[in-house]
Amino acid sequence: MQKSPLEKASFISKLFFSWTTPILRKGYRHHLELSDIYQAPSADSADHLSEKLEREWDREQASKKNPQLIHALRRCFFWRFLFYGILLYLGEVTKAVQPVLLGRIIASYDPENKVERSIAIYLGIGLCLLFIVRTLLLHPAIFGLHRIGMQMRTAMFSLIYKKTLKLSSRVLDKISIGQLVSLLSNNLNKFDEGLALAHFIWIAPLQVTLLMGLLWDLLQFSAFCGLGLLIILVIFQAILGKMMVKYRDQRAAKINERLVITSEIIDNIYSVKAYCWESAMEKMIENLREVELKMTRKAAYMRFFTSSAFFFSGFFVVFLSVLPYTVINGIVLRKIFTTISFCIVLRMSVTRQFPTAVQIWYDSFGMIRKIQDFLQKQEYKVLEYNLMTTGIIMENVTAFWEEGFGELLEKVQQSNGDRKHSSDENNVSFSHLCLVGNPVLKNINLNIEKGEMLAITGSTGSGKTSLLMLILGELEASEGIIKHSGRVSFCSQFSWIMPGTIKENIIFGVSYDEYRYKSVVKACQLQQDITKFAEQDNTVLGEGGVTLSGGQRARISLARAVYKDADLYLLDSPFGYLDVFTEEQVFESCVCKLMANKTRILVTSKMEHLRKADKILILHQGSSYFYGTFSELQSLRPDFSSKLMGYDTFDQFTEERRSSILTETLRRFSVDDSSAPWSKPKQSFRQTGEVGEKRKNSILNSFSSVRKISIVQKTPLCIDGESDDLQEKRLSLVPDSEQGEAALPRSNMIATGPTFPGRRRQSVLDLMTFTPNSGSSNLQRTRTSIRKISLVPQISLNEVDVYSRRLSQDSTLNITEEINEEDLKECFLDDVIKIPPVTTWNTYLRYFTLHKGLLLVLIWCVLVFLVEVAASLFVLWLLKNNPVNSGNNGTKISNSSYVVIITSTSFYYIFYIYVGVADTLLALSLFRGLPLVHTLITASKILHRKMLHSILHAPMSTISKLKAGGILNRFSKDIAILDDFLPLTIFDFIQLVFIVIGAIIVVSALQPYIFLATVPGLVVFILLRAYFLHTAQQLKQLESEGRSPIFTHLVTSLKGLWTLRAFRRQTYFETLFHKALNLHTANWFMYLATLRWFQMRIDMIFVLFFIVVTFISILTTGEGEGTAGIILTLAMNIMSTLQWAVNSSIDTDSLMRSVSRVFKFIDIQTEESMYTQIIKELPREGSSDVLVIKNEHVKKSDIWPSGGEMVVKDLTVKYMDDGNAVLENISFSISPGQRVGLLGRTGSGKSTLLSAFLRMLNIKGDIEIDGVSWNSVTLQEWRKAFGVITQKVFIFSGTFRQNLDPNGKWKDEEIWKVADEVGLKSVIEQFPGQLNFTLVDGGYVLSHGHKQLMCLARSVLSKAKIILLDEPSAHLDPITYQVIRRVLKQAFAGCTVILCEHRIEAMLDCQRFLVIEESNVWQYDSLQALLSEKSIFQQAISSSEKMRFFQGRHSSKHKPRTQITALKEETEEEVQETRL
C-alpha cells in the first residue's frame, strides 16, 4: 500500500479533496486492488490511537474512584471535535441569511423601488457567494467529524480487544457472543455515522432562534403558527416512531428465530442433505419468514407515513405562517417567497436535525457506559511460579466455576444478601425450582517431581480440563495451595490454528531453532503431511485450519506446545483426533522420548498411556478417585476400569443396570421436579430466563456433569417471597432498536453475527471449547460451510501499567514487520463475491420483473406523475392567458420602511399554491407509494425463498467454496436491506426524480433560457455520478472485505485464548489486530474522502447553475415580480432536490448490490442438475438423454432397498471438477447385513468414502444397492436408502418431535417405540412436554451421548437398510460409548453397517475391514486375516490389547511390521540426542 498523499498535500488540495483524484481516476479506468489503496495517515493508525486513549483511560482510573470513559475520550478528541463543530455552525448560518437576500432580490422588481433595482445584481452576487462559503465550510467540517468518529471507533476497538485478552474465564463465561456483536459491530459504528450530526444538539436551537427572529421581523406573530405546526409534526412523528418500535420489537423475535435456524442449517448443511431434510427445513424457515414479513410491512408503512409527513408539512407550514398575515395585510409576494425559504430551513432543523442529534447523544452515552462497564470487568490472574518448587504441588485445592451458574445464581445471591449456603451441595432453593451446583474440583492433592509424567483420566465432566485451567490461572482456586516450578506450555483439547503458515503456527513467535523445529516436526509425525503441500511448511492456513484434517490440526497444536521451551507441559487430550496408527507413534516419539526430561501432565483415557505414566490421577465428579502409580492402581482399585473407564465389563451389566447408566451417567443436566407441576399436559415450557440466556453451551456445562440446572418455567419466580418476573430474552442477530439499521450499506458483514454458529445464545468460552469437525482433510474441504464465522466484536484493556503487558517472558522473534496487509488478507480467506463495480441494468431488469405486480405499480406511478405535470401545465396556461394588471387590479401600500406589492386576486397566489401542493403530492404520493413499498417487500419474500431453495439444494463442492458467515450475511444483512432500506430508497428516488422533472418543466415554461442552463447541469450530474460510482463501490467492497478480518481475528483469538495466555502471545496478537484495523481504516478513510470529493463538486455545479439562473432571472424578467420569485425559488429547489436525487441514486445502486449478491446465490447450480449433467456424460446405451429408472421396484419405496447389498465399481472421488482424485478406482462389495469397518491414517479418505456413498462429492464409477445403480435413481431416493450418523451431531432449535421427524411422517406411537428402542425414552420423559419440549442452542440440555442417540433414532425411523457411522464415539467417555455400542447392536441388527472409527475396541463387531491408504483400497478382509503376519492392521494393536480382546487369536504369531510412514525409524541413541 502506498503512503497517503494527504500528509504532504497543500491547503487547497485538502480543502477541495483534490488529493483523492488519482485513486478516482484509477478506479474508473481499472479494477482497484488492495495495493492501490493509500495507507491510513499516521494520525489514524490503530497503534497511535490505541495508545493515546489507553493512556488517558489509565490516567482516569488512577485518579478517580469512579472513572468515566467519557472523560478519557474528551481529553483525546474534544478540541478538534469543537473546532469542526464551529465550522459546521458557520456553514449552517449562511442558510439562514440566504432567504433575506432572496427577498431583497424579489423586492427589487417593485417598479417604484429604483434603488433596490439598481443593486439587484449585487444582491445576486452576494447570494451566490453565500452558497460558495457554505460549500467551503460544510464539507471540511463533515469530513473532519467523520474522521474523528472513525478514530474514536478504532481506538475503542483496540481497547476492547486488549481487554478481551485479559478477562478472566469466569467473566468470559458470562459474556455472550451477541453482547459482543452489539457492543462493537452495531454500537461503535454509530460514531462513524452519527458524529457529524451530533453538533446539531446546539446548532439547531441557535438556528431556530435566528430564523424565528427573522420571521418575526417579516410576519410578526404569524410566524409562530408555522412553528407550532412543526412541533405538532414532531409529536406525530414520535407517536409513529413508538408504534414502529413496537412492530420492530415483535419482528425482532421472528428475525432471530429465522436466523438461528438458518445458521444451524448452514452450519450443518452436510447433515441436512444426508437426512434429506431440505424440503422440511425450507418449509420451516418460510413459515417463520411469513410471520416476520407481516411485522415488516407494518413497520415499513409507519416509516413511509413518517417520511411522507415530513414532505407533506412543507406546504402547510408556509400556509399557516403566511395566512394570518395575508388576512390582515394582504398578499405580499416578496414575503411569501422569503417565508418559503425560511420554512425549508426551519423544517429541517426542527423535524430532522435536532431530534436526530438528541438520539445520537442518547445512544452514544448509553454505548459509552456499556463499554466502560466492560473495561472495568475482572481480569484473569497469572499463577506465579515458585523457583523453589521442583515440579508441581497441589494441597487441598477446591475450585468453583461460580459464575458458570449464570445471572440467576447471582440474582439469588444478591437477594439473599450474599449469604453463603452451608450445605455440602450448595443448594439454592426457590419456591418451586432448584438450582444445584457442586465444586468442579474438590480437595485435590498431588506432588509431581521434575521430569515425571502425570496421566489424568476420568469420565466426561469429572474435572480433568479444569485441573489444567487451575495451573494456567484460568480458574481460580477457592481454597488450597498450588505451586509450580517454571514456565508452562499448553496443548488444548480443541485444536486451535491461527491464521498464518504452518511454521508460524508451530513457532508461535518464539525464536526459531532449526534443529529443535525439525525434531518436533518429526516427533509429531508431521513430515509426511508437510511434504504434501506445495509450499511445504510455508503453506498459509486459513480460518481454523480449514485445509487440514482434524488429526493434522491436533498434531500442529501439539507441536506448538512441544516447541516452546517450558518447564511444565499441559497436554489436554491431544490424541482425540488421531487414528490408531498415528497415535501410537506420536505418543512414543514425542511424549515418551522427545519430552522424557520434561514435567508432563497428560489428560488421556488410553490404558497404554496410563501404564507408561509415572503417576496417575483418576478424577470422579471433581474428586480424586485415585492418585498413585499404575501398579498401585491395579492393587488398590481393581474395579477402576469398569467403573470409570468403561471397558467390556459393561457387557456383564444387567439390562436394568444398563438402563440406569444410560439415564444417569450420560446426563449432564438433571431436572428437579419435586415441586414443579410438570405433569400438566398442555403447559408451555421453554428454556428461558436468566439460566436459559446466560448459561447455554458454556464450557462449564462440559466440566461439571453433576451440576444441576433447572428448566426455568415461563412464570414469575418467587425468591424470598418477592416476585421476580423472568422475561424470555432472545439474542437478535440484528439490532434490537432497528432490525434493518444493522445492515449498513457500506458493510458486507452482518452486524450481528454471526455467528451465527447455530446458537441463539453462546458464551465466549463456548468458542474455546467448541468441537470442530474432526474428519479427514478431504471431508473438511467438502464441509467448509460448516465452520463457524461468528462476527464477534472486540473488547478492551484495563491495566494501570500501560507498558508491562508488552513484555514477553520468552525469547521472542519480532516478526511484526513481516506481516503485511496482503498476507493478512490471505490468512483470513474472506469470501468475496465478485460483482461489477456498478450495478448492471440486467440486475434492475431481473429485480423489477421478479413480481408481476411490480411493473404494474411502476406504470401506475408514471401515470400519477403525468396527471400532476398536466395539472401544472394547465395552471401555467391560466397564468399566461390571464395576466395580472397591477395597475387596475392591484393596490400599492407603502410602509414606513418597505414598499410592498399586493396583487388583488393574484393568479400568482394560485400558482404558489400549486407549487406547494404539487411538491406535496409528489412527496406524499399515497396512491403510488404504498403499493410500491408493499410490492417491493413481496419481491424480497420471493428472493429469500429462491435463495434458500438454492442453498439447500446446492452441491457440497459449491458450498465448500463459500463461508458460513458469507452465506448467513445474505440471509441476514442483505435480506434486511431488501426488507427495510431498498423499498423506501427506491420510492424516494422515484419521487425525487419526478419532482426534479416537474420543476424543470415549470421553470422552463416560465423562462425558456433557464432550460438551456438546466440541461448541461443534468448531463454533468449524470457523468460525475458514473465517474464517482466506479471507484466508490469498489472502495466499499474493499472496506467490507477489510472489516471481516477484524471480527474473524477476534473470534480466532477467543477460540485460542487459553493458548495465547499460556504462551504469553497477547502482544503479538494485538499487533496483528492493529494490522487488521489499519487495513479497514485505510479503505474506509478513502471512501469518506472520495465521497466528500463528489459531494463538493456536486455543490460547485449547483453554485454555477444558480449563478446562471440568478443573472438570467435578473436580466431578462423585467417587471415580472412574481415570475422572478418563482424562478429563483424553484431553481434552489431544483438543484437541492437534484443533489438529493443523485445521492439517492447512489444509495439505490449500493443497496441493489445486495440484490446482485442474492441473485448470485440463486443462480447456483443445484445438485440434481449437476448429477443429471454427469449422468448424461456417462456412456449409455442409445442416444436418449432422458433418465430412465431401469429397476421398476425402486419406484415402490417399501421394497427398495430390501437387503442392503452394495457393489462399488471403479469409484473415483474428487472434491472439485478440476481437482485431484482423493479416492481412485476403488472396487469392493458388501453383503447384505454385513458390518464393515473403515481403517486408515488421518486424511486417508475414510470419511470421503462415506460422503461419496451419499453422492455429496464429484464421483465417477458405479455404486449399486441391491442391483440398482446410482445413476438410475433420483438423488433424494438414493440418500433415503442410507441411515447416517455424521461426525457432527445436528440438533436444531425445535421440539423433540421435530428433531426426530421433521417431515411429520410418523405418529407419536411410532416415535415413542423407536425412542424406547434406542434408550432415549427415559430421557425425553424427564422433560416437561416430553416430545413437545423445545430444544434450543444445539440441544444444550442434552449430553453428547444423548445427541448421538437422537441421531440413532432418526436412522431407525428412516427404515434405512444401510447405516453409515462416521466416528460416533468421538468425544465420548468409554461408558457412554458402550451404551451406544449396545444400542447399535440391537437397533440395526439386520442392517448393513459401515463404520469409520479411531477406537480399536469400537471396531470389534465388524466382520470385515476396509483399509484405505494412498487413495486406494489397501486391504479388504476379515478380522482374522488382518491379524495375520502380512497385515498392517495389527501394528495399531498392542500385545496387551490382543491378549485382552483376542485371546487365543494369533497372539503367538505377532511380529513387528514396517510402519506406514514417511519418517525413518529412529534408534534409541538418536532419540536420546533429541530430547528436550
Curated annotation (Swiss-Prot):
What exactly does this protein do?
Answer: Epithelial ion channel that plays an important role in the regulation of epithelial ion and water transport and fluid homeostasis. Mediates the transport of chloride ions across the cell membrane. Possesses an intrinsic ATPase activity and utilizes ATP to gate its channel; the passive flow of anions through the channel is gated by cycles of ATP binding and hydrolysis by the ATP-binding domains. The ion channel is also permeable to HCO(3)(-); selectivity depends on the extracellular chloride concentration.
Give positions of region: Disordered R region.
654-826
Protein name in UniProt: Cystic fibrosis transmembrane conductance regulator
Q: Which Gene3D superfamilies match?
A: ABC transporter type 1, transmembrane domain (1.20.1560.10), P-loop containing nucleotide triphosphate hydrolases (3.40.50.300)
The stretches that face the Extracellular side, renumbered to this chain, are 99-122, 217-222, 320-339, 875-913, 1007-1008, 1112-1125
Q: Indicate the family of this protein.
A: Belongs to the ABC transporter superfamily. ABCC family. CFTR transporter (TC 3.A.1.202) subfamily.
Annotated residues for binding of ATP 2: Y1215, G1240, R1241, T1242, G1243, S1244, G1245, K1246, S1247
List the catalytic activities from the record: ATP + H2O + closed Cl(-) channel = ADP + phosphate + open Cl(-) channel; chloride(in) = chloride(out); hydrogencarbonate(in) = hydrogencarbonate(out); ATP + H2O = ADP + phosphate + H(+)
Outcome of mutating F508 to E/D/G/H/I/K/P/R/Y = Abolishes normal maturation
Which tissue types show expression of this protein?
Expressed in the epididymis (at protein level). In the initial segment of the epididymis, detected on both the luminal and basolateral sides of the ducts where it is expressed in the duct columnar cells as well as in the interstitial smooth muscle cells. Expressed in sperm in the caput. In the cauda, detected along the luminal border but not continuously and is also expressed on the basolateral surface. Within the caudal lumen, detected on sperm. Isoform 1: Expressed in a variety of epithelial tissues including colon, kidney, lung, small intestine, pancreatic duct and testis.
Q: Which organism is it from?
A: Mus musculus (Mouse)
Q: Which gene encodes it?
A: Cftr
